[in-house]
Amino acid sequence: MPKHSINAWIVDDDQSLRWVLEKALKQAEMETRSFERAEHLLEALGEDVPDVLITDVRMPGMSGIALLDRLRGSYPDLPVIVITAHSDLENAVAAYKGGAFEYLPKPFDIDEAVDLVRKAAGLNGGTPQDVDEPTGAMASMIGQAPAMQEVFRSIGRLAGSSMTVLITGESGTGKELVARALHDHSPRANKPFVALNTSAIASELLESELFGHERGAFTGADSRRIGRFEQADGGTLFLDEIGDMSPELQTRLLRVLAESEFYRVGGQAAIKVDVRVIAATNQDLARAVKESRFREDLYHRLNVIRINTPPLRQRQEDIPQLLQHYLAEAAQELGSSPKSLDAEAMEALQTFKWPGNVRQLVNATRRLTVTAPGTVISAQDIPSDLGGTESSQQ
């Protein structure tokens, strides 16, 4: 913590927000200046440099992301806190890639913002790692709910990293989407992303699926097979439902994570690989460890960074946007015009508990696109198992 009073500057075109932040920072005994545009801030930096900068993303003239890029070259040790009302995954990742100290979606708790300024002022500086922009299309992720914003922030913080990640959450919450986004915003973005649902393959076949086999390794092994680890070399391997893996395969997986090498089934030569592993589960792995169903050492290897995907019932404010997005996607698949929802239908779907989470919602939009007559979906078009009032004769 610096011995002098912290000097925090604010850039935001919202006068009321500037006033609230200035007041809170001054009450915390900090010095502050505020600017309506990034260009005005850059002029002021010729005279003085603050300890911390708070900037909005979308402003007239230069954006907050463009400002970050400018500051990264000229003032690499200046901690920047990015605030935005347009809080999506792309903005979060762009902010962290640009070197932001933290990303704070609006509306935010003013005390949290003041605490972040204190933390940022204690930085020793440091230059963020360069990360290549992904060449592939980014996985579609939608969410304004606080729980989803935390997911976006976690992905943004990990941009530039190849750390092992454990994604937890109920079935259908989009764990593979999170894994793809982590890959797309990592240094491995231009390398393979290989996904495998370990619970969908019989245990006796999973070993060969993961590690491959040599010709003649077992009955029916007529040729050499390259496994998923080799396919993912240089890139990312996503292992879904890791909690269902047999003890024997857990041991083999642990060795790969520890030594970055493995043997094909029936093979004699060790094969070196460079693979980032992202695992996912809908189980409580800590409990599975206590019950001796999951190796404790493997659990700690996988649980380096954890991201939890929230169930849809905990992010009801996102349901209208999700419905609109996936209704449009379903219409595109069918080659038809997108359907909309009337107010009663929207209310029915927004209050529905969605036990199958986003996966169930996606399937529901396809179903409604096919079965609902006309271009506007009413509550009468929605089946009762989705919270609607569809008559049994429809």
Regions found by a protein language model. Give the residues of each.
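The feature encodes the CheY-like receiver
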Residues: R18, P60, T84, D88, ...
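Active-site residues of response regulator receiver
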Residues: D56, T84, E241
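Acidic catalytic/metal-coordinating carboxylates
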Residues: E36-R37, S63-A66
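Conserved post-Walker A coupling segment in P-loop NTPases
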Residues: S154-T219, E230-S246, P311-Q316, A364
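Flexible nucleotide-interacting loop at or near the entrance of a catalytic core
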Residues: I110-E170
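Nucleotide-binding/hydrolysis machinery
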Residues: D111, D115-K119, R188-K191, G266-R276, ...
